[in-house]
């Protein structure tokens, strides 16, 4: 007869550590999804053409941002390993290297996205959407460098097990984004 063993205290401690570390990461990832959802919801109440233009541009940038996020994920295990061994001076160098690499990637992605911007009229979208797409595209293009810098710092913070900082920054960014969207959507004379 199989007798169920009581859960070992070590396992319980591991589960607690895992949840303490992982829940802020999950909340932060949900925050990224909420960011896009809030944009879509607010623009959708304004006009169908603006929603179509924003959706197209957002999808173009999603490809670049997912690529950049995947690139930045490489830092977390390196920093985590060094931090776990107490090699804090090397951890700092890894952050500097990551910032440099992410800035280089931002320059490359900005160039690629700029080429797409110059050729947006060739991507088969209705002519009436192009004047709506262009200013929004430029705003997202300007923000690309900041997204990559944030990714570098977020992955560094995750690597040193400080996952709450990036979670709060993402949630705070959502609040600022909603406020920032509300003004031009509600007061159309302030839009680009």
Task: State each model region's role.
Residues 27, 39-43, 54, 79, ...:
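Hydrophobic/aromatic residues within transmembrane alpha-helices of membrane transport systems
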């Amino acid at each position: 007869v199989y007798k169920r063993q009581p859960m070992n205290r070590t396992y319980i401690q591991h589960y607690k550590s895992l949840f303490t570390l992982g829940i802020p990461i999950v909340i932060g990832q949900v925050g990224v999804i909420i960011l896009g959802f809030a944009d879509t919801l607010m623009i959708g109440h304004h006009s169908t053409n603006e929603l179509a233009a924003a959706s197209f541009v957002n999808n173009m940038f999603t490809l670049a941002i997912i690529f950049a996020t995947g690139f930045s994920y490489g830092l977390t295990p390196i920093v985590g390993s060094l931090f776990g061994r107490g090699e804090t001076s090397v951890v700092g160098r890894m952050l500097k290297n990551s910032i440099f690499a992410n800035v280089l990637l931002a320059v490359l992605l900005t160039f690629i996205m700029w080429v797409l911007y110059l050729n947006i009229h060739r991507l088969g979208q209705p002519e009436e959407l192009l004047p709506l797409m262009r200013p929004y595209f430029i705003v997202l293009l300007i923000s690309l460098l900041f997204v990559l810098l944030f990714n570098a710092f977020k992955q560094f913070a995750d690597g040193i097990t400080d996952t709450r900082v990036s979670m709060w920054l993402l949630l705070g960014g959502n609040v600022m984004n909603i406020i920032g969207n509300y003004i031009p959507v509600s007061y159309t004379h302030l839009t680009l």
